[in-house]
Structure formats: structure tokens, C-alpha cells
Amino acid sequence: EQPMAAAIGADLPINEPVGNMVIDIGGGTTETAVISLGGIVALGAVRVGSFDIDAAIQAHVRREHGLAIGERTAEEIKKSIGSAMPTPRERDAEVRGRDLVSGLPKTVILTPQEIREAIDEVVTQMVDSVVRCLAVAPPELSQDFLTRGMYLVGGGSMLRGLAQRIERDTKVPVNMSPQPLEAVVLGAGHCVENFSALRGMFMDSRR
């Protein structure tokens, strides 16, 4: 499963008797897994990801500014001024698209605050999924989460302020993977190279 591969890619001690919590935010899903002794002991998933953030930005710009923009422009807005929480030195962004009334090119100014509000519903669904997974995790692993923190991977994890938002709402420290985009791929590659040794773990990753 992807969370297991992400945990391996993040070099977490998945075979040790400690709780490892991984949050993998991809394009269409957010998966949260608690891994201990080589198995997944709690798993949560919700069908929202970074693509849904882009769609929310598109819908907001269309509804509030009468402007049609493409997926690539929405992604650029997310990267330039999108955030899950207020951040230092925020700046407005100039965005170009097609006026829905005249059909002509049009430029509007977007603020970080309005984009934050536009994507808040999606971000909240992501965070709530993490909260639910924490709630069903074995209680004896709670101390591990508090001392070692959770690990955030996946392209969607790069949204500014998301780690801080999860930490605020769960009261559990959040660590960003040094290679959030590559964690799953690195883990999958390690699994292929060591398939014989890891086969049993993946055959029974849900305990």
C-alpha cells in the first residue's frame, strides 16, 4: 500500500515496536496510516487531494470574479499564494483569464486570504481524515506520536501552512519529509530491490 511505501521511502523504523504515522496527500486522495512492527494498524483515507484544491480555486475565481481559468493557472495560484494558514510576507497575485461575460481576456487581483477561504473546505476534509485515524489508533502508540510526530509526504503536502494546520488541530507534531514528492517512489524502489525480505510484510500489512 502507498502509505507503507511512503514510510519506507521516508526511512521510518517501520519494523520496530513504535508507532509511525504517515500522511500521504496525493492528487486525488489523502491517506493516513499508523505503522508498527511491519504492519498497518490503523488506516484512514478520503478522496480529496491537491487536485481538489485546484478545482476549488477555479470555482472561486469563476464565481467571485467572473473569470474562467485553466487547471494549470489554478495550480500556479495555489503555489504562489495558496496556504492552509496565514503565513509571513503574504502578497496578492495578478491572474489572467477569460471574462465570462465578454469572452475577452481579463486580469484580476487575488488575495491570499480569499484563496485560503476558497480551499478551506478541502483542507478541512484532509485534516479531519487525520484526526479520525488518530482516534482509532492503538492508545499505547499515542506517546510515540507525541514524541516522534507524524510524517507528511506527497505533492499535496507542500501547500504552505498545511503541516502547521494539522499540528494545530491534532496537537501532535508534524514533520515534513525532506523528499515529499519522491517518498513513495523511493519506498517502492526499495521494496522491489528487497522483495523477498519484505514480501511477508506486504502480504499482511493490515494487522
Regions found by a protein language model. Name each.
Residues 164-190, 198, 205:
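Conserved phosphate-binding/catalytic loops in two-lobed NTP-binding clefts
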Residues 1-23, 189-193:
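Conserved phosphate-binding catalytic cores of ATP/NTP-utilizing and phosphoryl-transfer enzymes
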Residues 70, 89, 190-207:
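Acidic, glycine/GT-rich loop-and beta-edge segments that sit at the periphery of enzyme/chaperone cores
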Residues 22-29, 35-39, 49-51, 130, ...:
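A short acidic Gly-Thr/Ser loop motif
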Residues 3, 118-146, 191-194:
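Phosphate/ATP-binding catalytic cores across multiple sugar-kinase/actin-like superfamilies
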Residues 37-120, 135, 145:
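Phosphate-binding glycine-rich/basic clefts of nucleotide- and phosphate-handling proteins
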Residues 86, 142-166:
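Glycine-rich phosphate-binding loops at beta-strand->alpha-helix junctions
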